[in-house]
Amino acid sequence: MAASDGVQMTRYTECMAQVGVTSEPLDVHALTREVVRLKPDTTYEDEESVRLKPDTTYGGTDGAIATFTGLVRDHNQGRRVRFLEYEAYVPLAVRALSLIVEEAQIAWPTVRLGIHHRIGRLDIGEASVIIAATSPHRGDAFAACRYAIERVKQIVPIWKREHFEGGEVWLEGATADPEDEAAKQVAHRIACA
């Protein structure tokens, strides 16, 4: 990731998570490798220390990895989309992503989670958001992944401008208060449906 982008290793309960907001292309396979590598009950100084310790690879108890990749599509609301632009207040976006990971950890304690979101111009077919969840059981991995994307849409301060044939428009972004219990319950209901 570029030096100006936000990457954060977050310590929560008994495991770690990686969250980030970047203008660089997203790689779900790299994020998945990083999430699998995060070992419970281990304190990492920063992102680089995880990469430098190959002996920290952890996956013996995991039976599932679930991923989600959000892509830029070529249409929306009956219009042909040319490209999207995402903007964010990066420090607050990283904090909101970390909060989502903490919430997921409370609901699914065995899950380790990573979330990255792009900013800047994205062309059709490019990944805008990636989520990786690893867990001993597939149900928890799927549910945590689904919960994470619902909460990203609710609370992360990232704004999207859609450029279409004949114009452009800002689309409504995150509007829920991160502390709003009703919004959390909606996301949890969707994740567990």
PLM segments and residue spans:
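Extreme N-terminal basic, low-complexity initiation segments
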Residues: 1-10
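Intrinsically disordered, low-complexity tandem-repeat regions
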Residues: 2, 45-46
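N-terminal, polar/charged subdomain of small-to-medium soluble alpha/beta proteins
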Residues: 11-39, 46-48, 52-128, 134-136, ...
